[in-house]
Curated annotation (Swiss-Prot):
Might act as an E3 ubiquitin-protein ligase, or as part of E3 complex, which accepts ubiquitin from specific E2 ubiquitin-conjugating enzymes and then transfers it to substrates. The gene is ARI16. This is Probable E3 ubiquitin-protein ligase ARI16. Belongs to the RBR family. Ariadne subfamily. Keywords: Metal-binding, Repeat, Transferase, Ubl conjugation pathway, Zinc, Zinc-finger. Binds 4 Zn(2+) ions per subunit. Zn(2+) 2 binds at residues 169, 174, 194, 196. Residues 74-288 are annotated as: TRIAD supradomain. A zinc finger (IBR-type) spans 148-214. A zinc finger (RanBP2-type) spans 453-483. Zn(2+) 1 binds at residues 96, 98, 125, 130. Zn(2+) 3 binds at residues 201, 204, 209, 214. Its EC number is 2.3.2.31. Pathway: Protein modification; protein ubiquitination. The lineage of its organism: Eukaryota, Viridiplantae, Streptophyta, Embryophyta, Tracheophyta.
Length: 500
């Protein structure tokens, strides 16, 4: 994990704005242009400060004129302060004399900002043929809703152009951003934890899914998860008709026991006998033998769905604990124990590590699902690794609880903090090894069955998942094997090209 060598930092929205303003101020100060003009320049150039410096250094006046940041008409006497009625005023850009009411500007800019949301192009004067650019200095004269919309437009432009190194947390309602550190490598940062408790994959934006690949995580998230829930619901809430074996759901009245199947067979929901077999006596007991159980594939889906949901509940508790740590515990530690910023970082990283580890354990059941059933040795070994990782995590969470509940003085805090630092490092290293072992495919574990037999695998045409030839459909996306040639009839390389 990244707890003891974190390659990213979590920023509040105000901190992101500060970074943005720093770039604007640098261009403004070095090339003696207003902050408003510097903002327009950076938006137009995709926030490429180096390119902006080159163009401003080569021919500043020509470049500014090209962007509509130079006067295009001799302005008449200012009437920006002249009232037009109902509190409305006439406003123009600093580069032209075309004046329009604030109402017209507001309507125009609302539409223009929405259209420019993707293109990040220039916004020109409201006059049809005028090339004067609209910047923050013009926006400042307008209403508060327009100002807020324009500020968000600038910020989103900044984020979009820096998305390789900084991204918003995708959690609903969260306003934190995650930024890679200067020595961080985007390819090496896979899982990040926001201060809101949400963990997500830097590459694909889904919730963090290590040790599962982005592709398999997407398939599980968008298709298999819903299918598994449907299968689980069917086997919990239906019974198979004794005649046609089709799953049948009880009607809305739990007291009405006679079920009508689409095959025209009527049977009792309790004992599965027909109405005639009851002979008017409905005082029956449930049958000892249930209806047809799930298939091997369905059973596997139900099993892993239960593991997934148990892991999800444990993750929710870890996230809730992290929020409480941030909102309640840390302020108390500062007040009662005199905790410094470095101390708080230690406690915060311990809580974030707990969330990361719970996320890994949750997704490890999906990794287990992707292992074909004949690789039983790998499944057993994975079960062993998961048990070790769970034990290690419980011990780490115990150390964090000790600090939270028992550190009542600066001396206590120092003692428990030292233990927590050791636990964070050891637990992070253990889960790093756990993840790496799974992502590398556990090469030291020899799979049972057909592992070394020629032609014992086929790759799904839809999702490229590797299946065994005994599987008649893909275990990941259920694409049928119909179009794949059997290994028994496939021609050997030395036979290719031979005539009859």
């Amino acid at each position: 994990m990244e707890a003891d060598g974190q390659k990213y930092s979590v920023l509040a929205k105000t901190q992101v704005r500060e970074k943005m303003m720093k770039e604007i101020e640098q261009i403004s100060e070095v090339f003696l242009v207003s902050k408003s003009d510097a903002t327009v320049i950076l938006i137009r150039l995709g926030w490429n400060s180096f390119k902006a410096s080159d163009l401003l250094g080569d021919n500043k006046e020509k470049f500014l004129a090209k962007l509509g940041l130079a006067r295009v008409l001799n302005s008449n006497s200012s009437s920006a302060d002249r009232e037009t009625g109902d509190g409305d005023y006439l406003v123009s850009t600093p580069f032209c004399s075309h004046k329009f009411s604030t109402t017209c500007w507001s309507e125009y800019l609302s539409d223009a900002l929405k259209k420019n949301k993707e293109q990040r192009g220039l916004i020109s004067c409201l006059s049809q043929d005028c090339v004067a650019s609209v910047g923050p200095d013009t926006i400042e004269q307008l209403t508060e809703p327009v100002k807020e919309m324009y500020e968000n437009y600038i910020l989103e432009s900044f984020m979009e152009c820096h998305k390789a190194t900084i991204k918003w947390c995708p959690a609903s309602g969260c306003e934190y951003a995650v930024e890679l550190q200067e020595d961080g490598n985007e390819d090496n940062v896979i899982s990040v934890v926001c201060l809101c408790g949400h963990t997500f994959c830097w590459t694909c934006g889904l919730e963090s899914h290590r040790p599962v690949s982005c592709k398999k995580a997407s398939i599980w998230w968008t298709y298999l998860l819903d299918q598994s829930r449907s299968i689980s619901w069917i086997h919990t809430n239906t019974k198979s008709c004794p005649k046609c074996k089709i799953p049948v759901q009880q009607n809305g009245d739990p007291n009405y026991r006679l079920i009508n199947c689409i095959c025209s067979n009527n049977f009792c929901w309790i004992c599965l006998r027909t109405e005639e077999q009851h002979q008017g006596n409905w005082n029956c007991s449930p049958v000892a033998v249930p209806a047809a159980g799930p298939s091997t594939v369905e059973f596997s889906q139900i099993l892993h769905l239960n593991l997934w949901e148990a892991g999800h509940e444990a993750l929710k508790k870890a996230k809730s604990k992290l929020r409480a740590l941030e909102e309640k515990i840390i302020p108390k530690l500062i007040e009662n124990c005199g905790a410094t910023e470095l101390d708080i970082r230690t406690v915060r990283e311990a809580g974030m590590l707990s969330v990361q580890c719970r996320q890994v354990l949750k997704w490890s059941c999906v990794f287990d699902y992707s292992i074909i059933e004949y690789e039983s040795t790998k499944k057993q070994y994975l079960k062993h690794l998961r048990a070790l990782a769970s034990t290690m995590l419980c011990m780490h969470e115990g150390k964090l609880d000790e600090l939270i509940h028992l550190a009542l003085s600066p001396e206590d805090f120092t003692n428990y903090k030292h233990k927590l630092e050791i636990s964070t490092t050891c637990t992070g290293n253990h889960f790093d090894g756990f993840i790496k072992e799974l992502e590398d495919g556990k090469p030291e574990v020899k799979a049972d069955g057909y592992e070394n037999e020629p032609g014992s695998r086929w790759f799904c045409d839809r999702c490229t998942f590797e299946n065994s030839w005994v599987d008649k459909q893909c275990k990941m996306c259920f694409f049928p094997l119909d179009y794949h040639p059997s290994p028994q009839v496939a021609a050997a390389p030395e036979d290719l090209g031979k005539s009859e």
